[in-house]
Amino acid sequence: MGLFEKLKKGKKSSQPAKTQPQNHQQDLSQKMAPEIRPGGVFMVQLLMKERCEMPSNEQFLEALSKHLGNVEQFGERGVCVNFAAHDYIAELKDGGVPVMLMVSNCDEFATDQIDDFRRSQMWDCMDDRDHILSECRYQVLATDTLGGGLPAKKRANMLMDYLEALLELYPQCEAVYNINSGKMILADEIRKKEISGIDRFIRYAVNVRFFNIQGTKDHIVDTLGLSLLFIEDLQYHFHDMDPNWVVNHAYNMALYLLNNENPIKNGDTIDGIREGAIVQDIQWKCQYEDALIQPARAVLDICMNEYAAGNRS
């Protein structure tokens, strides 16, 4: 029996079943980008149409304390404002230190920083992508520092509580762009609060991507964003299965890894798919490998038995 037996079938992805091939030049030769460094800095941009003023310290503390507990502002306000989240202590070699939160001034948003490759993988708001990137000319950058010193589930919840507080502070925010994963999602989708707990991190911070392999019938589904929690991203290289089923499996699998503290080892098996449903009597083997699609990183490759593509040892 595989490690995936208790997960329920999750929400369908907004990614369409028929997707045009992504003809992008691959570059896996570069070193790991800082935004996907395991345990690295969480980075999101709040996108808006008009420039806005930074909230007052009192407004910040009211919203952040409601969501994050004991929060203290420190340092001078300038191009940014900084806070210490005292209920979230990062365990470092020299002892515990509160996680630091930073929120920048509202500044111009350089849309050209998002290349065609990343734009092609914004499945959660594909219908709104172009008008958001053309109309939202301003952004507020928000980050955490030292969050990698928290347990994975605690950091996942903290980051999403932080994000919900930011969207209360910035009601003019139209969309959230996650620099770590390349995911863009409408701010109102988060404001609805239809998802709770650590599920929010999987839905709002992890990007499940889809690629057709030009000249073949092969596809790749992978994730980006799990490395913030010291969890390897997922990769599926396959043919002859509905990609939406695989996207759904990837979201469920990502949630399983987070819920269970990343328990999978090389050679372990997980529940597979039959007619879109996750079933126990089909088992897929897992293996840690190098990513097939940029950025360069280690991934947990899922071998889909007769649907698997490519060469595996």
Predicted regions: what is each one?
Residues 2-65:
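N-terminal alpha-helical "arm" segments
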Residues 40-50, 136-146, 302:
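Short, hydrophobic/proline-enriched secondary-structure or compact coil segments at domain edges
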Residues 45-48, 52, 147-155, 238-242:
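Conserved aromatic-histidine-acidic binding/catalytic patches
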Residues 52-131:
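N-terminal low-complexity, intrinsically disordered segments
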Residues 56, 60, 151-162, 242-249:
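Short amphipathic alpha-helical segments
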Residues 65-76, 161-176, 256-264:
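Structural alpha-beta junctions
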Residues 104-207:
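Internal, hydrophobic cores of structured domains that mediate oligomerization or house catalytic pockets
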Residues 181-313:
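Aromatic/basic-lined ligand-recognition segments
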